[in-house]
Amino acid sequence: MKKPTKKTGIIVSSIGGVLSAVMIAGTIVAYSYQGLLDVTFQSSDYVASVGEKELCKNVAGEGAVLLKNENEALPLDNDETKLALIGQDSVDFVYGGSGSGSVDTATAPTLKSALEGAGYTINQTLWDFYDTGAGKDYRKKTPDMSGHGPFEVNEVPQSVYTTAVKESLKNDDVGIVVIGRSGGESADLPTSELSTGSYYLQIDQNEKDMLKMACDNFDKVIAIINANNPMELDFLEDETYKNVKAAFWLGGVGQEGMHAIPEILNGTTNPSGRLVDTYAYDSTSAPSFKNLGDYTINNSTVTNGNKYLVYGEGIYVGYKYYETRYEDVVLGNTSGYDYSTSVQFPFGYGLSYTTFEWSDFNVTEKEDAYEVTVKVKNKGDHAGKDVVEIYAQKPYTAGGVENASVELVGFTKTGVIKSRDSEIVKVEVKKKDLVSYDYKTNKTYIINKGDHYLSAGRNAHDALNNILALKGKSTSDGMTEDGDKNFAKMIFNQAEIDATTYSKSEVTGNAITNQFDDVDVNYYEDFTYLSRNDWTGTFPTTFKNGSWTATDKMLADLEFFDVTSDTTDDETINAFTYKSDFKDTTYKLPDVMELPYDDTKWDDLISQMTYTQMTKLIRLGGYATVQVDRIGLPKTIDKDGPSGISGTLVGGESTMAWPAEVVMASTWNAPMIQNLGVWFGEDSIAAGVVGVYGPGADIHRSPYSGRNFEYFSEDSMLSYQMAAHELRGLRSKGVLAYVKHFALNDQETNRYGSAIFANEQAIREIFFKGFEGAIVDGGANAAMAAMNRMGARWVGAHRGAMTNVLRDEWGFEGFVITDQASVPAMFYQDMISGLWAGCDMWLNTNESYWALSAYKEDKTMQYYITRSAKNIVYAIAHTWAVNDAYKTNTDGTISETTSKIFPWRALLWIVDCIIWVSAIGSSAFIWISYKKKPE
């Protein structure tokens, strides 16, 4: 036998060494993330039910908003069956958004297949041009999950179209133009001009040319606006594109929503959606636009603590700015503002294929509410649904508490009303929704002095015009059109400010007072928020021009909070007795799960957990919660899921991808969204998923937020109701729905630790409302803390938010988890101050991170750790993982989870053994070969 050469020995030894190193490193990584890898997913035979698919389609159908319908261009005539789908967005339709809110639509229908399935003939030459021909190189571009990459519209230039493609249009009856925009996590839409010379929310030159091509070839063009953010749509009024006879908006359609489009075109579905955002002619005209983007605290060296953002607009978000400024012009309080050139489509706007006549408006006072009734009659030929929107006007006194001219306080959607039939609708307006938050003087909720109005309107502008008509105003005073005073009523006059009636929580009875003085930028610098007392003088500019030299106090506050300096809990902690490493197990979770949170048996149960078990429950909450056999706590799986459970994590299957939240809200059909929550919950059980990271309840503060698709609306009341109803559905199935991102996470740029400043009135009346609805009316028992700061302090460590409002005012009984905490960049989400404030769990999958072993003998931390463990266990006890009562499906059957376990440990051991044996065997072979004497 030939003796191996020295070179061979070196090579074999090196390979063995490398394999051993890889094995060791891989094993360390695997065990560091064992909490993430120890997962159980549904089996691959999941199939959505017929009812679920129908609901997904119907949500998209009811969420579609008809913007224009000149000469009844829609629905299409029966002989208009040959359609040309024009624009690259026709083959690159927006189904959702990117990031954690993305959904798996791999099996979703295309626009072409959906239309063909409904009997339409689609121009194949044009489709192939976009899909596989020269047009395929043109697609929308958006940044990746990390926020890297450009936003590009990338419509196909006219120069790329061949003669054959353009000639093919002559064979079609109607042109269907699709204009799309998308967004996603980690990046906001660009607020500066693109290389094309237009803003992202404007149509660019290539799109204009594409529209011109469509209008040159067709007498009837239908535009589909497939965008989750409100675009500038002035082309709908441009004579150049006069053949665009109809247009409707429809955002991310989800898995089955595409099937709603042919039904809208043929009239099977009569559009009944209403806009959830104001559509301005100039998307940069909103006061929030002046404070969007990347701003730096130039003298801060704190990790993830050198960025800031000031909500200078105060309460004047969306229509609350545009409509209020309009009223002040009509009342003669200001000038220099033209509503008709500012707003194209007001909040709440939407057309129908039929005409609805309203009458018999009436307001009846009840004990805690007003009941508003309206008779709705269908005067047209198409059956359809209508939306009745109720708005309030609260009095404003110059220099006093800010109040918008109108704000939504209730709404309802009719059933299907047949031609010539009518329906009387009732809307309850709670008296508590007529309050304002006075953060300067009374520091609580007040009923302001003066006249209070209610108005029924087809949109916010219509409702305001009705109030103005009741005040005696008309077009001669500058109104855009005369209102109808018969749909407005002055419901009461408040003689003096009432700062008592609503100064205590209706849920807990605790006093309500300021919690966010430190979030107001005036805590550090003098600043004036936008006020209707002086629109021009207080209109926001970019705070500190984007570069802020912070005070020493603020720099200190950006650092980790020293919990030992706080004495709030001293009395409770002194009375607390920590039972370490208890050996007896008197109770198991099923023994106490029906008991109220304050029952002492819960404390007895938690005291049976060891310190290590409690801290693992807190530290390792990424996509799963740990199992604790000692108390009968099962392991649970959590998934991203604002719009449905996605199978993007280490394996697993996908379930129904629902339309984007912005589409859900556009239905203005709260019971429908509650039903969606029920189906979503049944999906979760079928998938073996207990916790869902969603829904999102932040606000569309600006048209440019990248994640607007994942949130409901610019309006606080609509967000409140949609979040509440979706949560009711999810909770009815025992799903742990983590309402997110609490709070002030209304911008993606610099979300890692950015210091967000706002006044307390805006925080409570605007930015907290969606979360309040999810918790107070929806029963949410889990929430996700945002990555940003409230003021100088990370949200999860802000006690005012985490405990004083969330628990002491809203009665929240559950736990708060952080956003992503599995990488060192997230270590600013300090666990010690977070536990003190009321954050309970870290979304972490790495066993070596967030160690708490050093605090085992620290009584203060023992208390906070035990409290958080209780919050977590209590919430999980109220899920389908523990309580089988949640598993009864809508059809009466019992849902069973079919598990598929990924045996990664066994596989890792086998691979390790093979590598070890190979390495040892190779080395031994070389060694023996060298030692052998030549034959």
List each model region and its residues:
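Glycoside hydrolase catalytic-domain context in secreted enzymes
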Residues: 1-438, 446-456, 460, 508-935
